[in-house]
Amino acid sequence: MGRVALLLALCGCLGTARRPISPSAHPVLVYVANQASGKVTVIDASSDSVVTIVDFTSLGFSAHPKPHHIVVEPDGSYWYVSLVGDNAVVKLDRANHVVAKAETVTPGLLALDPKSDLLYATRSMSAVNAPARIAMINRKAMTVEEVEVLVPRPHGLAVAPDGQHAYIGSLGANQIAVYDAKREQVGIVEVPGGDTSQVIVGLDVSPDGKTLVATAQLTGKLLVFDLADPAKPKLVQRVATGDWPWLVTFTPDGAEVWVPNQRSNDVTVVDARRWRVVTTVKGDFAQPDGIAISGDGRLVFVANHNTDNVMNMGGISMAMPLPGSTAAPGRVIVIDARRHEVVRRVDTAPDGSGLGVGGGKP
């Protein structure tokens, strides 16, 4: 299947002791999307302190831009955020200046292609009638190509380490779309599960490219797929998690998989060799959502909505502050990845959703 090129050229704290991170000319920064408040909170990972809060309305965007998810260039030179309310993916530099934007309808999750200049974007969970397409954005020119992926409500997203395949999970069907970047073709994989809707929220691929994992919100499972044939993921394991498993990530060494559970307010840690639960991290979680791990694998950062309100979006439930209400601060929980212990809480602007990490080496 050929690409359909649109080419839209457009431009707190609880504290047990933790080891300090050595200073860097370009420190490791954690960017936290605060969807309901239209802001992004920037945290210095060396001190777990808020460096600044980027207000997108003050940057010329709408009153309700809804920043949802963030990815960062590995060297921290640029970061990208999906603005659900403004139908745009925005590129900013290290100084938080807007460099360019790419227009695409209700963008949701983002993923960098590690082998090219491509940035993938799916659709927001809040987009009930989202197009069955993903956006492929050239990160240098910020031009867009829309690709039909043939599954309803495409949301979950992961790109293989070699950049050859992208995996897209459907919120509306038990399906995963596989985009072959070389052949420019899309295949559909049916996820076993009968007629029960699983609601695939998050995806990730192991660092060695051999395994795909997906979270199934309604069944409370981590789905494990073998990628011996990367075009045809094969379901080989189901691992019980907490309630409403959300986004998911492998550790940099591929040894563990970490899953925030939005309704049980905890994080499941899974051994990625035996596919058994190692532990469940408890702490000051409050509707956790996004998760990211520092490049050296030492620290895990989990964004939290911190709201008791649950919105129904086309049959899918998620934590989200009630529109017009006075929202409590969002929060990021910082975890020692080796000890599986919470070490710090950092309060942010209200409604923490997705987050990204980048910059110098911690």
Spans of features found by a protein language model:
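Bacterial N-terminal signal peptides
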Residues: 3-12
